[in-house]
Amino acid sequence: TLKALEHLYPGALPQRGGIRVEFREDQLSGVTGVIANVVALLTGATHDTGFKGIGGRFDRRNLLYFSADVAEEIRYTRIDTGQSVDVAARLQSVPFAPQTFALMQKCLDGSATPQETAEFRDCWQARVRALLLQHGDDPEVFVLRPVGP
């Protein structure tokens, strides 16, 4: 989201509520809904439950869409200019710790010890931390594709 906003508002402060966001996946697919919550917080875009505006202005509802026909995972569009950028996350280039999936399986089937549960949580959070802090500016991980002319 940060990279998309930087692209759409170069050198300027993004306009909260001035962005339409479209997700390729359904809101219940994988972690799409979770990601959409973060995107909504940052952009002001909401589906139908957000800020309804004041005096008919500043309505932020109906700016967040799912199951959209977009090329990448998420499309961000400036309402005022129509400029759009598609964003994809290529997360496979940032590996999990080798034990992560075995620990996940134990957590899911209920056989994990408290220590294994804590280790799984730590492994998962370490990868999230690496994605955001070490690879947040990596164009091979977070790919932006301008849309249109």
Locations of regions flagged by a protein language model:
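Non-transmembrane, aqueous-exposed alpha-helical and coiled segments at domain scale
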Residues: 1-149
